[in-house]
């Protein structure tokens, strides 16, 4: 049970009822937003619906409900109970939760020039205790802005993104060949099984290729065990973060718990390998005089003396750590939804093949000719967001739904719950990419927050979007994607949302020659 009287089945039932009560729905649909529903004076913060002010009692109930790994369902249940805004204190952490896109718009439009988001407590504790250098993920104010403006030019600007296309295309083609090898090994004409490990390696090879301009060989038949340890460390870092979210990480460190030791060891490995890669590629790049291709983000940063070397190292480490599990998980969910919805898969394949003909194989042009495919990535992230919330600390007092929320309060937009709310997404359980192509005066950009919003949105957003687009183009050209079982796969919160159990695919090649990709 999620909570007394409300089962998980009731929350996730097909054709589910809206989380918002009819009264709340009519307010949302009639006014298009929450803060202007009432013309009365704003109500005080303590009147926001809440399970109670005893944070430790709330945390006890949260644990009893197994909320730690099911926090996205916990949010949904609370919106059912309290309406479109509620506050909850877990331990000593107090937050306000919202799910209406119009409320999200008000939140983000008030964030100021130096937005601050929630920082994962054990990550902060590790960096502070071991005095590790920090990049834009942890920085704030002018220090954050200085680094971020430089990095935006390297990884967010349209001209910079074009440089990444040939690098990512080569990685994707090698991944397609990995799948063909798997098919040959099974000797059945297709591949059946779990490809999550291959996707992790693909994502790591992709981000290192963009950052360093060189390949690590993660998609070869024999993989460097040291590089694999880096991937394993990232997973361990996410996994061990969860138990320390609602209790002070310093307690785990003080008592030398297994959780803290494993967490610190994971970060140690991440920093060690990231530093090894950065130093190795740095000296290789310095010895080269000319480049026949784009040499990568690291060289571009170093060549212009745009940031101190320690800042570059810290930001490169954060990019590598954030570019593996997140992207690979979204790709896995994308393949899952395509396999669950074969008609949609065929529509996507038809668009890709038409784009290939029109662009004559030019991938830079192709990625501009697949709007439905890009919409399918949005639709995947609506149903399976990487982060269950997007957060901001208020700069000033803010009135939402006629409640005054004080400055410095943490406000969280519940991504997962928003994506499942019928008031904002009709027939929310249906995988329907076309919903993102429809033009309507009632839609808002703030329905899609998977990469955050504004100047503090995900730094790797453009890399991830390009990487996923090129990946799906090539997979759709080469394989028909099916599932071994059509039973729904549940999700668990492991700091990011992951499948509760392995997803087992059936991949059927669309070309007779299994040794080559369709576009070589």
UniProtKB/Swiss-Prot annotation:
Main location: mitochondrion
One BP annotation, GO: cholesterol metabolic process
E.C. no: 1.14.15.6
Catalytic function, reaction form: 6 reduced [adrenodoxin] + cholesterol + 3 O2 + 6 H(+) = 4-methylpentanal + pregnenolone + 6 oxidized [adrenodoxin] + 4 H2O; 2 reduced [adrenodoxin] + cholesterol + O2 + 2 H(+) = (22R)-hydroxycholesterol + 2 oxidized [adrenodoxin] + H2O; (22R)-hydroxycholesterol + 2 reduced [adrenodoxin] + O2 + 2 H(+) = (20R,22R)-20,22-dihydroxycholesterol + 2 oxidized [adrenodoxin] + H2O; (20R,22R)-20,22-dihydroxycholesterol + 2 reduced [adrenodoxin] + O2 + 2 H(+) = 4-methylpentanal + pregnenolone + 2 oxidized [adrenodoxin] + 2 H2O
Superkingdom of origin organism: Eukaryota
PROSITE patterns (alphabetical): CYTOCHROME_P450
Entry protein name: Cholesterol side-chain cleavage enzyme, mitochondrial
Topology relative to the membrane: Peripheral membrane protein
Transit peptide, UniProt annotation: 1-36
Xref: PANTHER family: CHOLESTEROL SIDE-CHAIN CLEAVAGE ENZYME, MITOCHONDRIAL (PTHR24279:SF3), CYTOCHROME P450 (PTHR24279)
Protein localization: Mitochondrion inner membrane
Organism: Mesocricetus auratus
UniProt-listed InterPro entries: CYP11_CYP27_families, Cyt_P450, Cyt_P450_CS, Cyt_P450_E_grp-I, Cyt_P450_sf
Pathway the protein acts in: Lipid metabolism; C21-steroid hormone metabolism; Steroid metabolism; cholesterol metabolism
Subunit structure comment from the entry: Interacts with FDX1/adrenodoxin.
Methyltransferase is among the record's keywords: no
Family assignment from sequence similarity: Belongs to the cytochrome P450 family.
Keywords: Cholesterol metabolism, Heme, Iron, Lipid metabolism, Membrane, Metal-binding, Mitochondrion, Mitochondrion inner membrane, Monooxygenase, Oxidoreductase, Steroid metabolism, Steroidogenesis, Sterol metabolism, Transit peptide
Pfam families in the record: p450
Any GO molecular function: heme binding
Cofactor(s) required, per the database record: heme
